[in-house]
Amino acid sequence: MKKTLNMSSGFTLLEVIFVIVIIGILAGVAIPKLAATRDDAEIAKAKSTIASVRAALSTERQLRVLRGDFTPITSLNADGAGAFTVFSLDGGVGGNPPVSRPVLGNTVPICAPGGRACWNAAAPVYTYILPISGNLVTFSIQDAGGTYSGQFRCTGNANDCRLLTQ
């Protein structure tokens, strides 16, 4: 007499359906979190850019004062190649020709049409477009009276300013 073993390997239909349901639940929870994380990263990048621009502006102002040059900084993109490329020319103190130093170590590109989470520049006003709402948040290097203050102040909506500067 011959014995045959009936060994079947594989998953039952119930097990496969159970795994598919669990994967669906996990995907439903994870995908919205990943989308929010990307927007949070864009906001963090904008905050970092703002802090870097403010530090560079303060440093440039102090360098000019130390050299006895009180020429106001009127632009952060004097060459028009990006949002924060080079400062406007200094006064060329001590017989030196006027120079324009870089604002940041990298060029921040201008927004493409319809872009979000990017910068636009039209000195003395610089605008950031929020990634989620598309709201414009404006920053200026002029004070309310039109004087070039050497500060990079948020002049837009208070809530949007708070989001980017705190």
Language model: regions and residue ranges:
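Short, surface-exposed interaction loops/tails
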Residues: 124-166
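Aliphatic-rich helix starts adjacent to a transmembrane/signal segment
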Residues: 4, 33-51, 60, 64
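Long, low-complexity, serine/threonine/proline-rich intrinsically disordered regulatory regions
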Residues: 84-119
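N-terminal leader/signal peptides at the extreme start of proteins
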Residues: 1-11
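Short, exposed beta-strand/loop patches in secreted or surface proteins that constitute
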Residues: 76, 115-120, 139
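Short, glycine/small-hydrophobic-rich surface segments
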Residues: 57-98
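Alpha-helical hydrophobic helix detector
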Residues: 17-33
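Alpha-helical transmembrane segments of multipass membrane proteins
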Residues: 27, 55-58
